[in-house]
Swiss-Prot record:
Keywords: Cell membrane, cGMP, Hydrolase, Lipoprotein, Membrane, Metal-binding, Methylation, Prenylation, Repeat. Residues 196-348, 380-564 form the GAF domain. PROSITE patterns: PDEASE_I_1, PDEASE_I_2. Pfam families: GAF, PDEase_I. Binds 2 divalent metal cations per subunit. Site 1 may preferentially bind zinc ions, while site 2 has a preference for magnesium and/or manganese ions. Residues 65-135, 958-971, 1047-1065 have a biased composition (Low complexity). This is cGMP-specific 3',5'-cyclic phosphodiesterase.
Amino acid sequence: MRIQTMILGCAFLAICIIGSSNAACDEPDKCTPEECEDPANAAEESCAENPDDNPSNPDDDPSNPDDNPSNPDDNPSNPDDNPSNPDDNPSNPDDNPSNPDDNPSNPDDNPSNPDDNPTNPDDNPNNPSNPSNPSGGVEATTAANNGGSGSNAQKSPRRLSNSSVQALPEGRRHLMDLDEGDLFMELIRDVANELDIDVLCHKILVNVGLLTHADRGSLFLAKGTPNNKYLVAKLFDVTQKTALKDAVTRARAEEIIIPFGIGIAGMVAQTKEMINIKEAYQDVRFNCEIDQKTGYKTNAILCMPICNYEGDIIGVAQIINKTNGCMEFDEHDVEIFRRYLTFCGIGIQNAQLFEMSVQEYRRNQILLNLARSIFEEQNNLECLVTKIMTEARELLKCERCSVFLVDLDCCEESHLEKIIEKPHQQEQRTMRAIKGGDSFEEQQKMRNRFTVLFELGGEYQAANVSRPSINELSHSTLAQIAQFVSTTGQTVNICDVHEWVRDHNQIRDSEIDSTHAILCMPIVNAQKTVIGVAQLINKANGLPFSESDVSIFEAFAIFCGLGIHNTQMYENACKLMAKQKVALECLSYHATASQDQTEKLTQDPIAEAESYNLYSFTFTDFDLVDDDTCRAVLRMFMQCNLVSQFHIPYDVLCRWVLSVRKNYRPVKYHNWRHALNVAQTMFAMLKTGKMERFMTDLEILGLLVACLCHDLDHRGTNNAFQTKTESPLAILYTTSTMEHHHFDQCVMILNSEGNNIFQALSPEDYRCVMKTVESAILSTDLAMYFKKRNAFLELVENGEFDWQGEEKKDLLCGMMMTACDVSAIAKPWEVQHRVAKLVADEFFDQGDLEKLQLNTQPVAMMDRERKDELPKMQVGFIDVICLPLYRVLCDTFPWITPLYEGTLENRRNWQDLAEKVEMGLTWIDHDTIDKPVEEFAGCADEEIKDIEFTVTTLNCNQQSQSQSQSQSQSQHGGDDIHTPEHQRSSGSRLSIKKTGALGKVVRSKLSKTLYNSMDGSKPKTSLKLLESHVSEDMDDKSPTSPSQPHSGSVGRMSASSSTSSAGTVDKTKKRSKLCALL
């Protein structure tokens, strides 16, 4: 659009200027033959040049009707030529000088008047009625003879000289018929639409030669930076006969560079003023070297600037020697030259814009190829940098290219601090040539250490990779410049290296002798940290690097930085992967069971399943030693016929079981024994619950493996804790964090040498069993259970009996895994409450960590301060998760009813305990929940005159007797009955006399713990029993009532009295309940 706009403006401006060009020779009498070529110069020349007077011209042939006297156009009797004809009669106002139509001052005859404009049909030479029409030559003569003085009759437009006509190629011979105005317009059209800069410059020089009758011309284009401008000869010494190809080839073969201010063209470029020289050899600015080489003698020179629309110099045009016999370029030539170059400036700028767009497209293609190479070559830094340097050398046409890589680990602290203090310095990308000053010397004190140097020389030279030493870097000028760039982060463009070396007192080494220009730029990564320096040396044409080169190189450096950074990251990743592989090998060695353990387990006899109680839903591992747990696992695999069915080597199976046990951490609940209990429940569901008939052998294998591995490497914390602490596991797995980790650990063990129990499976079976294992382990996340539960319930409620579909089988296996994972809730009470204590302790440990590390209040079930609420929370857990699951499973598979019934029984026990806690009991500080009475408190609004506490330590045989004795003492009311001395010899007695409000809390600070050994040698359970006797002084005026527990006192046992009969009945019931407890 911009180019089209300029072309339209160009055409409009041409129309406005053409009229004034015709006025150059309005007074031919004042023109010398040298100044103006018209028919009055010489007979031969006039005859040769003017086709109207040529005898061979049909216009002058007597037989030609236009020149024949009998021709009515030339006949005196013809009214057009007759003096009496008003058109030719002097008295005719049209030809009368006094007639305003012919008066030069008349605007109708003014060259700028459109009525006299060559494009105006009244003044157009081609118009037969116009006196200047060549075909009307006789008419013009007749008019003159009849006294017509009109200036129009004397106008003779300038035409091409004979020499210029002879120089025209065949395709441009039509120009000889045009006068100067039409020729000017035609030559403007000739260049208006040309966008090839070479063709355009050639046309400009040829056309200027035609307009000014110049022998030859040259055109220079401005190049360089604002501080270093120079002219480059685009085309030089172009004549009318010089072909475009020859002119371009010669200009490129011998490139002529002229700095601004040097020579005639340089002065014109610097001053923007025209220079017209009559005698070139008498001007000191003229350089005669070209004449001496070519043998051509330059006489007259006309040199004029070419500016763009902003007035900036974009080139200089120069024409030499006149061809029409004139010794110099006159004012008319200067004016024509100036006007034509005005349009040429617009055309040159359009062509340059077009050339820039083409170059930009090519550069983008090169950058895209570079980007493609970067992403294709990311595993080898040397190959990548070699490709980058090759592309840079081809793009910017330089002789050599180097890349220095920085060792970031060796950066000095002061430099790092400077980067932190002034980060904007790393973002600055300014091009400047290093001049004087202390900046370079100051920056040498803060150096980055270069570790690798890549160098690429000529086109046929291979890349050189070296690791320069500090000594080599300190004695290399190029390395010193690279050090400066890496330290400051600035782009450096040195136009004259030798001058720079002198200014900075650097020692000239051999590599500097052949260096004249250097472009050096930092290479940064995504964090704007300098990771290297790219250095270009010497433009191929000997010129300094331009501003355009800097811009291109900056984009190139960005791609270079991305490629090097990515490749370095890839190499680091490869190193980390190698380290990880070594670490996994070490981990695998230490995580795998030893050979001695494997051989021992392999040789141990394996008892029958009944001896381990594997078929029962009441299985417990409390009585099993660690080796027995491994044997029990082996027996389950044998009973399911998995060893022979899938050809599992027995020693591999033994090693795998021992390795799985070894990879469980010694946390309080989620340990190896929990995994054993889950696997045993699955085994019981398959065998006793008869669910194996719905499973394939491969699925049974996968489910047993998943049960044993479902909590591998458990840390005693849940998924929420991993997320809150932003642990590496939470970063690695965003959902089901621990479950994904458990599966990965399972895979790691299977991949360890000698542990792959799936080694005999086919690829298809292997994929199938691993899919089962993964899905089953992930199903142990309760979040997954809640997602799948509704779909499973819907299938069961619809009476589904076919579980062979892939989705339905996945649902069923997921529900079975959850049922096995929480199966401790269905164990006998003596097992269940011990397991609940272990779970609570692990939860409380996590709650303590949350308080310590996160400074947050944990949820109730993990808050140690709310330990007495655990029975109530257990009831909620059963109601929300366990009972619905076991109920729906029993509805479909009635053989697993024991799980449902055991859960119901334990719910009643937990509910009972929860009610006791509400009455004032606490239990969590004990190892077991047997008789969890700990504290006793008085009740408000009552007076206690004498409260006596007796704390007695009992054994198991004394327990029931103590309970009955306590009940008896409570029934006696205020009698002070003491335990016999021989029954409390192992205990202690504390009597407290207290008067005052009953709301005062009185606690027993003394307690003894009895460890009852079930086998007579090892403590198994502990019991605290507080035996109390309350004696009250009877007041004659106030009735007394037995002490009752206070329902509003949580964790305490209180004594109270009431005068209300209704309250007495209610308290009596609570008293009875308390007595039953004791």
